[in-house]
Swiss-Prot record:
One Pfam family this sequence matches: UbiA
Protein name: Protoheme IX farnesyltransferase
Record keywords: Cell inner membrane, Cell membrane, Heme biosynthesis, Membrane, Transferase, Transmembrane, Transmembrane helix
One Gene Ontology biological process: heme O biosynthetic process
Keyword Transferase: yes
Function: Converts heme B (protoheme IX) to heme O by substitution of the vinyl group on carbon 2 of heme B porphyrin ring with a hydroxyethyl farnesyl side group.
Listed GO CC annotations: plasma membrane
MF GO annotations: protoheme IX farnesyltransferase activity
HAMAP family: CyoE_CtaB
Main location: membrane
Similarity field: Belongs to the UbiA prenyltransferase family. Protoheme IX farnesyltransferase subfamily.
InterPro entries according to UniProt: Protohaem_IX_farnesylTrfase, UbiA_prenyltransferase, UbiA_prenylTrfase_CS, UbiA_sf
Origin species: Xylella fastidiosa (strain Temecula1 / ATCC 700964)
Amino acid sequence: MAARLRDYWDLTKPKVVALIVFTALVGMFLAIPGMPSVVQIQSGALGFLGIWLAAAAAAAINQLLDAKIDAQMARTSWRPLVVGKVRPVQVLVFAGVLITLSMTILTLWVNLITAVLTFTSLIGYAVIYTVYLKRMTSQNIVIGGLAGAMPPMLGWAAVTGLSTAADWINASLLVAIIFVWTPPHFWALAIFRRADYAKASIPMLPVTHGVQHTSRQILLYTVILSVVTLLPVATGMSGVFYLGAALVLDAVFLWYAWRLLDPPDELFAMKTFGYSIVYLMALFAFLMFDHWLRLADFYWN
């Protein structure tokens, strides 16, 4: 029984989903200018659950549709569906249950806009990216990255309903950070795993354009990212504490991206990939801490 539960747990890509729902949680905290009301706490908790269920469902559908590809790649050849621990119909039913629960929670007890945006993001990743973009273009990560960048807006929507223009603008800034972060994050992994992608006929940028070109693109997007991460300060959403942290995190990421250029180093690409995960977690954590510090300063003064 425990082994079977673990198989279903693995279908949800728990580590990936954890980062997704963390950014959604930060979006919730940043959306509330003061102390949250009882209604906001309830909406936030149920929204968090609904977003997590949808992300888990998207991960399961991705594994269902990518089973043949996963079987050809060392990184994914262990997945439950690939090795026969679960059957395709079981994965389909599992994902369907998760989607039903997610949409029921978000529609009935959170708000309609969160449900619509969450479902749109799910389709964007699980179907449009997985079935079409991933297999058709080397810009798959760039175009499809929007679906994966949406969680902060989903979290923001859960507690505000995105009822004002300011809500849309501020939530969009958080989405923009993840959107621009996505290409250097995945391309670093793709450099390290490019033989796997080539074997599976997936046109990732290092496969179609080479490592050197991909490294230059990683640097370009990291430079853009270092600018985009300053926008929350420019708009007044975040303050000096976040600014200092963002500058340090950006400087380190830029060093990784620059170091990746000459000479192209596969092992260093994997280190860059690892740092990119730490980077995003830390950046959003500092966004949240900065928000709390500013709230504390407001109430103390």
